[in-house]
């Protein structure tokens, strides 16, 4: 029997998911937007981890925020990446291979593992004055 289309996936009888296009699952963790982008055998997980305080709002917190951003990459697990976006949002990313068959269980497991692993880094960013917040546009 042919795989059944379900949203951005083809689902085989054994539950294996085959991405069609570039599917992404979005979720929130501790008030932060997160995303899981799925490709064949891989998943890229990302979180908007915080934002550097604006000078107009909290200028005194900016030096600590930038110091934390400088130190944090050395503390991240292997394969993780920290990005400072042009609007001063901070993004944490992790790309990984999905072992075995890509199923809904494997995707949710990867998402939960990423969210739980984020906690100490979110704590670190918060202590340096970078909250989840909304970016001003």
Where do the language-model regions lie?
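A short, solvent-exposed beta-edge/loop patch
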Residues: 83-113
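A conserved amphipathic terminal alpha-helix motif
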Residues: 110-128
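Generic recognition of long tandem-repeat/solenoid scaffolds
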Residues: 22-29, 45-47, 92-94
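Generic alpha-helical secondary structure
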Residues: 2-6, 58, 62, 107
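Short, internal acidic amphipathic alpha-helical interface segments
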Residues: 50-91
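A short acidic-to-branched-hydrophobic micro-motif
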Residues: 36-56
